[in-house]
Amino acid sequence: MAYYNHKEIEPKWQKYWAEHHTFKTGTDKDKPNFYALDMFPYPSGAGLHVGHPEGYTATDILSRYKRTQGYNVLHPMGWDAFGLPAEQYAMDTGNDPADFTAENIANFKRQINALGFSYDWDREINTTDPNYYKWTQWIFTKLYEKGLAYEAEVPVNWVEELGTAIANEEVLPDGTSERGGYPVVRKPMRQWMLKITAYAERLLNDLEELDWPESIKDMQRNWIGKSTGANVTFKIKDTDKDFTVFTTRPDTLFGATYAVLAPEHALVDAITSAEQAQAVADYKHAASLKSDLARTDLAKDKTGVWTGAYAINPVNGKEIPIWIADYVLASYGTGAIMAVPAHDERDWEFAKQFDLEIIPVLEGGNVAEAAYTEDGPHINSGFLDGLDKAAAIDKMVAWLEAEGVGNEKVTYRLRDWLFSRQRYWGEPIPIIHWEDGTSTAVPENELPLVLPVTKDIRPSGTGESPLANLTDWLEVTREDGVKGRRETNTMPQWAGSSWYYLRYIDPHNNEKLADEELLKAWLPVDIYIGGAEHAVLHLLYARFWHKFLYDIGVVPTKEPFQKLFNQGMILGTSYRDSRCALVATDKVEKRDGSFFNIETGEELEQAPAKMSKSLKNVVNPDDVVEQYGADTLRVYEMFMGPLDASIAWSEEGLEGSRKFLDRVYRLFNSKELVTENSGALDKVYHETVKSVTEQIEELKFNTAIAQLMIFVNAANKEEKLYVEYAKGFIQLLAPFAPHLAEELWQAVAQTGESISYVTWPTYDESKLVEAEVEIVVQIKGKVRAKLVVAKDLSREELQEIALSDEKIKSEIAGKEIVKVISVPNKLVNIVVK
């Protein structure tokens, strides 16, 4: 029996595509352009896993489809290759991280090519290539020139084990680092920052123009966190000092009964009384050991210390105690809050814990029992009494501005981007600090500032990166004899990935980041597919850099990615015991259809979980390609379910996809191809063309494959296969199973050319309509026959067919026909006596 020999056919076509540069990006100016982008991978030592090809297959299907529709298609791949794992490996082994990275890239590329993706490898990029990061550094110098890259002494998330500071977004909810799970402590340090806050409003507003999942837009909106309210100034009793708080509810100022400063607030030491000094110092130290996320956890017990100082509430002159508490962050807002415990749950819990005054200023609720967080008329609020929320806010803001103690204010939760890392394996920041106190950017003609090769990449121990150890590279002298020192921090991994999609457009340009006309031709990216885990960090950073490049005239669009799609996660097979603990697959055996823990004998429940080394349920695509073939993997991952759903891996499903491809192969090896159309497959063929075309456009690949299966089932019932329908089917199959399609195309079309650019088939709307219908024939209201007739016959034609049917003739023999009622396309009712 014929079968699809993937081990022979797939390498054959991969070789053909590579030798013929089949997927080189088209440059025909008369054709429309289509840019399909994957989130490029970090080339880890573990290699590709089966989650990677899901998104890659989706963009590949679109790319192959668009080529056949006459588009120039840009479908590139590259490597996000800077990062901590390579550096950690280098420190552990003494090997160069560049060598480790090159080996990993070679392995990734081998695996990707084995899956038959139609990438234009002439455009391959690598963020660690000096010819690439020259332009990453160039963008930084432009940000620096515009005042958007600056140095600041800021409390950072310091990870001792990693020897570096990490961004807020890289701290997990439990206060450990995303990479490695190490403890994170707060520590003041000189850092490079990027002023992403200058773009907050545009980053927020321009989301409306994007075809992105609403959930991702909401995550960005929440991260940017726009708030409208007022700044209020509180004087500190018996001093000439004051502090400012931001509040979204200035109308509740009469209910402010205490104030809270962040432990790091600049005023804390100056206002703390002698009696409270030790308690305040101890508390500040304890707070420094916690991450921002741990400090602001709503579920944690409230802690704080009174400073011994009082503030004056500007609206009523009352003295209110000033506390410090770790749930207030120096980096958020002004680092100070006014507490209105009657109407805020956190303030109420804090007030109850430390026996502080609670004054209701909104009618409703019982503030002795709980904070009242609904709205209501104002009470205990002097000139605001009786007013609703909106009117009271307006009146209070007007009062604050008239009295010179406050003003209307818009704030954002978004913080400036902590851009420096104290590591070796990253882009050097192109800045020189001179002994006369000035700093300058490395001139463009000296870029790239190449990362020096060294075996000594251990952290310096001073908080600086290992580059601080390399004095030959570090120390420079200006033409006028002034000595300088290069910046030792390196850029975060996010830097190279914030603009890589631009370099694909013109990857070999030595004069500029990319040619303006080419950028105009290809931007914005038409479809960007990747994991939802990048919703905030990568996508927000890339949008920020793109808007900056738009402002300085480098790119022609305001946004980088017009359409975004997040593929779901492929979950692994895993097992849980009665305590819901996960059991590794190598500790499980199957008996009589049930699963048992080999060590304890306990029966286990099968439950999908994220693939992990510890559960030993990671599926390597190399193994799948070896056993089943790349086309099987592609078809299976697209047929598992909706592209955005998280679905468990299944060997049975994989086998089902392989059987489908074998059935396709046998169909073309067992049926005679004919040039005359019998019409038997007209409807199902044209339905298949219509359905697959529409489903590809909508990224509903699972239903497209289901329709291909329907056609195969119908075709198998026929003795012969109309050659034009055979060709059309192969074309529809090609984006999903390109190797098999190429092989079948050569046998059927016999053109000697790849199927990759053959014009996509079209469907005939008139053929989608049923040509025949089934009607019932009744005698005196009882069904006596069912007949298949041509659609839309007249009443007279139906009557004639019914009365001439042999079965009906025998039923009415010898009887008088009183009346015949015909309903086109439905029934004929014969009344006899």
UniProtKB/Swiss-Prot annotation:
Give start-end ranges for motif 'KMSKS' region: 610-614
Q: Name one GO biological process term.
A: leucyl-tRNA aminoacylation
Pfam families the record matches: Anticodon_1, tRNA-synt_1, tRNA-synt_1_2, tRNA-synt_1g
UniProt catalytic activity: tRNA(Leu) + L-leucine + ATP = L-leucyl-tRNA(Leu) + AMP + diphosphate
EC number of this enzyme: 6.1.1.4
What InterPro entries does this protein map onto? aa-tRNA-synth_I_CS, aa-tRNA-synth_Ia, Leu-tRNA-ligase, Leu_tRNA-synth_edit, M/V/L/I-tRNA-synth_anticd-bd, Methionyl/Leucyl_tRNA_Synth, Rossmann-like_a/b/a_fold, tRNAsynth_Ia_anticodon-bd
Q: Name a single GO cellular component.
A: cytosol
- UniProt subcellular location: Cytoplasm
Would the keyword Repressor turn up in this protein's UniProt record? no
The main location class comes to cytoplasm
Q: Which keywords does this chain's UniProt record carry? A: Aminoacyl-tRNA synthetase, ATP-binding, Cytoplasm, Ligase, Nucleotide-binding, Protein biosynthesis
Family label: Belongs to the class-I aminoacyl-tRNA synthetase family.
Tell me what this protein is called.
Answer: Leucine--tRNA ligase
- State the organism of origin: Streptococcus sanguinis (strain SK36)
Name of the encoding gene: leuS
